A protein has these predicted regions:
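Flexible metal-binding regulatory segments at protein termini and peripheral loops
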Residues: 1-132, 144, 230, 255-256, ...
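Conserved ATP-binding TGD loop and adjacent catalytic N/P-domain core of P-type ATPases
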Residues: 17, 348, 438, 518-520, ...
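Conserved cytosolic catalytic loops of P-type ATPases
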Residues: 27-46, 53, 206-209, 238-332, ...
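Actuator/coupling domain of P-type ATPases
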Residues: 61-69, 74-76, 80-81, 135-137, ...
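Soluble-to-membrane junctions at the N-terminal ends of transmembrane alpha-helices
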Residues: 81-103, 154-177, 339-371, 388, ...
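Membrane-embedded alpha-helical bundles of multi-pass transporters
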Residues: 116-131, 160, 179, 418, ...
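Conserved catalytic phosphorylation-site environment of P-type ATPases
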Residues: 296, 355, 390, 403-477, ...
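P-type ATPase nucleotide-binding
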Residues: 456, 460-588, 600, 612-628
Length: 846
């Protein structure tokens, strides 16, 4: 069972490490992850072996508070509540800080002003007023200590529980300075009572009230700055929450009624007008709209929607009017799921953080030990007690476990948030880290490299067979199949007006094709392997099939009663950005491998068109996982990119599984990274983002370790004998505050992350990239065509364009366009002439 808890009282990584350690000791707990940034904890435990009450008890015994987070609370509401709590805490801290600074300014003026020649009231000057001078500092320090008493409460409480943290260091440092100063007050009183002015003067010069106050104030300043910076790390989640419309227009009792969006019920009819945000997920019942989905997918071009199309909550209807049926509300909406994914990813730990976690767990006890040793060594070496104490206090307050603890989670939080803004959902910190290790990317062809919407490109009949007969039998058989190629054949036949009947005894042979009975005839539709197995003679058609395969078509032979009737060639257009994405991957040093069930010749045609380094053809759906495993056994770190149900095992097997956004729920569930758009360039972005985040984490960890490695010896006075350097407690506390702020600010640089290809094109991608492979220049173009009315029209245009040397074309009736790949010798005029000669009008070539 997996349960999320809110945890209170944590102030640094030592706290989170102790909470994690305490809960992991509870019998039945399998895994614990504590998030210092979100003050939350996720626990996986065996139901029956333990329960939430035992876990909360363990946290309380460790000196902190915990409560179960409501699993049914919508992510948007939870995030809003977190924002309110954070804002309230920031307001209190700001109030506390303001008064602390006010008292500190007066204290510093009095304690240091006489050294700088600044004017002081007469009652604070002279030997006879030394006690007044000291007591004034005491009374100015006490309010600062009271305002910041939280450090003492948390610090000493943690110390007594055997889990000292950063608050413990601050509390011990400021208390030591305060107690020593109070002891100097007694010495002053004793000396003045005996008339020993020099002794009293020496005691007055060794007061550290301003150090005690300065430590508390500077640490609070640092905490305030750190808090504000940390809040910015979750800006992406805040933006997502703000996307959701607050109200919805629904039809109740036949009337339009405006209600809060969270009160919409499943099955209700929701009205969406131009310019309005869509409040929930659902399906359009009537009307049309132009929907801006950029907030969810990152795609800037609005999408036309009509009856039957799905729409997503938090997207915006830019134009049009429609009514929709709500089918996903509250925590089930796409937006809520995205928020939950981003939160969970930000709260997860990357393996690179393990060293920092180990160090954080023992850091504070080690620092306290070093501080005690520092005082003892200086006293034994003959230094004054005030010098030794100042060095010990400096060690306590300069040490910063927070920098270590924040190094990884801040970078992961900002990185996953930045990914979400670009339509890339990263499920965990481990996935984010692992992606930077990838050296091989395996791409499923259909729906990943290609559009996933095949269309019939050519029909060839055997002698004595009509096209209508061939299409009728093929479509009747394929209608029982759910394969994309089958859908293309059925659609083509229906558009041609061919009668489609019902097939019986339907059977599918994996990797070969399908068979069944149509109008009393045994019909086969499949590849050459199926024809050979069924002993169907190809009558020389295999030569033409080979030519079509070399052009990137997938060829299906159609036979009836063991006699070949003809063949149908189907083409799946390559996505416009696939070539550029593959080129970018290769430039990043990644090996690109394409998996496809197509014939070898078809696969080689796609390989040549896109410049893919390696192709594995005729792969059965169940064998994709085996191919990924084989690559891993060769020593490769493999990322698998796919969108189908049969991709799920391969996605799970890969080091990183990437589900492309148009894919199935099963594929998305199996993946580590989900791309909301069906764009391969987002794979490039995901890998580059991973590399940027890991680089940022390494910078943070390097800073945190180096800061403590240099700062602690400096504070202890190691360099004093040689260079006469001694760090005062005030500078130590300032340095500690700066250290945490530096780490958070460095992580915030990731908010400006842009993938390399966007930088090249000024923040935009090239929609139709040109490519140069092995000295041969090829270009991909889109020809907009008017006048095509049916599948016969597309066939004529297809034939006209493919008759040109150096041209490979796929024609889409739905898009009223032809997608062509041409070599540099073919001009736009030649393309236009071919279409016009076929009897159609060209409205544009892109």
């Amino acid at each position: 069972m997996k349960q999320k808890f809110d945890v209170t009282g944590m102030s640094c990584s030592a706290c989170s490490a102790h909470v994690e350690k305490a809960v992991s000791r509870v019998p039945g707990v399998d895994q614990v992850q504590v998030n210092l940034l979100q003050n939350s904890m996720v626990v996986e435990y065996e139901d029956g072996a333990t329960d939430a009450a035992a876990i909360i008890h363990a946290v309380e015994d460790a000196g902190y508070g915990a409560s179960v987070k409501d699993a049914h609370e919508p992510a948007k509401k939870a995030e809003n509540d977190l924002q309110k709590r954070t804002a309230e805490e920031a307001k209190k801290m700001k109030h506390r800080l303001g008064w602390s600074i006010a008292f500190l300014i007066v204290l510093m003026y009095i304690s240091m002003g006489h050294m700088l020649g600044w004017p002081l009231p007469g009652i604070l000057l002279g030997h006879e007023n030394m006690m007044t001078f000291a007591l004034t500092q005491l009374f100015l320090t006490l309010p600062i200590m009271y305002l910041n008493r939280k450090y003492y409460e948390n610090g000493f409480k943690s110390l007594f529980h055997g889990a000292p943290n950063m608050d413990t260091l601050v509390a011990m440092g400021s208390t030591a300075a305060f107690v020593y100063s109070v002891s100097r007050l007694y010495v002053m009183g004793y000396a003045m009572g005996r008339g020993e002015t020099d002794m009293a003067h020496m005691a007055a010069m060794n007061l550290y009230f301003e150090s005690a106050a300065m430590i508390l104030t500077l640490v609070t300043i640092g905490k305030y700055m750190e808090s504000r910076s940390k809040n910015r790390t979750s800006d992406a989640i805040t933006k997502l929450v703000d996307l959701a419309p607050k109200t919805a227009l629904v039809v109740r009792n036949g009337r339009e009624t405006e209600i809060p969006a969270d009160q919409v019920q499943v099955g209700e009819t929701v009205i969406v007008k131009p310019g309005q945000g869509i409040p929930v997920d659902g399906v359009i019942l009537e009307g049309t709209g132009t929907v801006d989905e950029s907030a969810i997918t990152g795609e800037s071009i609005p999408v036309e929607k009509k009856a039957g199309d799905r729409v997503t909550g938090a997207t915006v209807n830019r134009a049009g009017y429609f009514q929709m049926k709500a089918d996903r509300i509250g925590e089930d909406t796409t937006l809520s799921q995205i928020i939950r994914l981003v939160e969970e990813a930000g709260g997860s730990k990357a393996p690179i953080a393990k060293l920092a976690d180990k160090v954080s767990g023992i850091f504070v006890p080690v620092v306290i030990t070093i501080a005690v040793i520092t005082i003892i060594v200086w006293l034994l070496s003959g230094a004054t007690f005030s010098f030794a104490l100042a060095s010990g206090i400096a060690v306590l307050v300069i040490s910063c476990p927070c920098a270590l603890g924040l190094a990884t989670p801040t970078a992961i939080m900002v990185g996953t948030g930045r990914g979400a803004e670009q339509g890339i959902l990263i499920k965990s910190g481990e996935s984010l880290e692992t992606a930077h290790l990838v050296d091989t990317v395996v791409l499923d062809k259909t729906g990943t490299i290609t559009e996933g919407h095949p269309a019939v490109a050519a029909v060839r009949t055997a002698p004595g067979v009509t096209e209508a007969e061939l299409l009728g039998l093929a479509a009747s058989l394929e209608k029982a199949s759910e394969h994309p190629l089958a859908e293309a054949i059925v659609r083509y036949a229906e558009e041609a007006g061919v009668e489609v009947s019902q097939a019986t005894e339907f059977a599918a042979e994996a990797g070969q094709g399908v068979s069944g009975m149509v109008s009393g005839r045994k019909v086969l539709a499949g590849n050459q392997k199926m024809m050979d197995a069924q002993k169907v003679t190809l009558d020389g058609m295999d030569a033409e099939a080979g030519k079509l395969s070399e052009e990137g078509r997938t060829v299906l032979y159609i036979a009836a009663d063991q006699k070949l009737l003809g063949m149908i060639a189907v083409a799946d257009p390559v996505k416009k950005t696939s070539a550029e994405a593959i080129r970018e991957m290769e430039q990043m040093g990644l090996d690109v491998v394409m998996l496809t069930g197509d014939h070898e010749k078809t696969a080689r045609a796609i390989q040549k068109q896109l410049g893919i380094s390696r192709v594995i053809a005729q792969v059965l759906p169940q064998d994709k996982e085996r191919e990924v495993r084989r690559l891993q056994e060769e020593g490769h770190k493999v990322a698998m990119v796919g969108d189908g149900i049969n991709d799920a095992p391969a996605l799970a097997r890969a080091v990183v599984g990437i589900a492309i956004g148009a894919g199935t729920d099963v594929a998305i569930e199996s993946a580590d990274i989900v791309l909301m758009k069906s764009d391969l360039l987002d794979v490039v972005t995901a890998v580059q983002l991973s590399r940027a985040v890991i680089r940022n984490i390494k910078e943070n960890l390097f800073w945190a370790f180096c800061y403590n490695a240099i700062g602690i010896p400096l504070a202890a006075g190691v360099f004093y004998p040689l260079l006469n350097w001694q760090l005062s407690p005030m500078f130590g506390s300032a340095a500690m505050s700066f250290s945490s702020v530096f780490v958070v600010c460095n992580a915030l640089r990731l908010k400006g992350f842009q993938p390399g290809f966007r930088k090249k094109h000024g923040g935009k991608t090239t929609a139709v990239p040109a490519e140069e492979k092995k000295g041969e220049l090829t270009m991909k173009k889109t020809i907009k065509i008017e006048g095509m009315m049916c599948s016969h029209c597309t066939g004529r245009v297809d034939k006209a364009l493919n008759a040109l040397d150096g041209v490979t074309a796929t024609v889409s009736l739905e898009d009223k366009a032809a997608y062509v790949t041409v070599d540099g010798a073919v001009t736009d005029e030649e393309l236009k002439k071919a279409v016009v000669d076929a009897g159609y009008e060209v409205t544009g070539i892109e």
